[in-house]
């Protein structure tokens, strides 16, 4: 997915992984097919359980221990060939296998991810302060966005990829065959703010089907769009924001007020 964060103030930004169908289900289906082939053709007595960020498994830690990559300063797992643009999944089996050893950290003295984080969410020892992370604030946080982060949210309406986009390991194109049908949703790629607002207002129930965006819920998505409109400084959006001042939803009403202040500041 060749999508870069848009700098245009009339465009919104949605994290890359949310531009496609829910990866949990896609990968789970692929792994199940793979294991059934192995079971049928190679090892009848194999038992397995699949995880795609779907259970209490320390995926990143196990991936590191198995040599898939090293932890970058932004805490993402980085592979020397793939960068950090990949999903992690696991298959637990009742067989012993040989496995690779952990690889060395190859970030060196680079601090691009730390320097580029708008909210300063990347702290020491490759840890993230979730309360400052734009991905957390726009997806997991169900309340209003803290006032000290409003401007820093920018035009991010679902997630944030900044610390990965600036990573030098993500600059090269991975040479890997991709036979997954991810079903790219073009209307999520740098959408115009007024169009994505209308889409979420009128077609949320259809848009959220098979999409990870449902995790933010409709209210969260609308909240994020209002903030992005405020940060655009574009008075064209003012009437669209103002109508939410009278919303029965206190979070949206408060956010609309915040967005107007952002627009006028």
Name each model-derived stretch.
Residues 1-106:
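Auxiliary alpha/beta "docking" domains used to position bulky ligands
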Residues 78-102, 130-149, 200-205:
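Short, charged low-complexity linear segments at domain edges
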Residues 146-181, 206-214, 220-221, 227:
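C-terminal amphipathic alpha-helical segment
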Residues 218, 248-250:
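Short inter-helical turns and helix N-cap capping residues of alpha-solenoid HEAT/ARM repeat scaffolds
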Residues 222-232, 254-263:
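Structural detector for internal amphipathic alpha-helices that build alpha-solenoid repeat scaffolds
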């Amino acid at each position: 997915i060749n999508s870069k964060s848009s700098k245009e103030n009339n465009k919104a930004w949605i994290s890359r992984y949310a531009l496609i169908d829910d990866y949990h289900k896609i990968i789970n289906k692929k792994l199940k097919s793979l294991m059934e082939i192995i079971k049928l053709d190679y090892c009848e007595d194999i038992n397995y359980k699949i995880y795609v960020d779907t259970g209490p498994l320390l995926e990143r830690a196990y991936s590191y221990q198995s040599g898939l990559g090293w932890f970058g300063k932004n805490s993402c797992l980085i592979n020397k060939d793939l960068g950090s643009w990949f999903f992690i999944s696991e298959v637990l089996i009742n067989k012993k296998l040989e496995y690779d050893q952990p690889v060395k950290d190859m970030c060196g003295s680079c601090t691009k991810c730390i320097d580029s984080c708008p909210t300063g969410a990347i702290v020491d020892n490759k840890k993230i302060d979730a309360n400052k992370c734009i991905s957390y604030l726009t997806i997991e946080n169900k309340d209003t966005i803290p006032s000290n982060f409003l401007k820093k949210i920018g035009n991010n309406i679902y997630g944030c990829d900044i610390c990965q986009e600036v990573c030098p390991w993500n600059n090269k194109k991975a040479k890997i065959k991709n036979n997954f049908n991810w079903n790219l949703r073009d209307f999520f790629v740098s959408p115009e703010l007024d169009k994505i607002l209308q889409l979420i207002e009128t077609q949320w129930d259809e848009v959220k089907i098979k999409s990870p965006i449902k995790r933010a819920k409709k209210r969260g998505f609308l909240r994020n769009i209002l903030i992005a409109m405020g940060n655009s400084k574009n008075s064209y959006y003012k009437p669209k924001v103002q109508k939410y001042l009278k919303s029965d939803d206190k979070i949206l009403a408060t956010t609309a007020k915040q967005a107007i202040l952002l627009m006028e500041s």
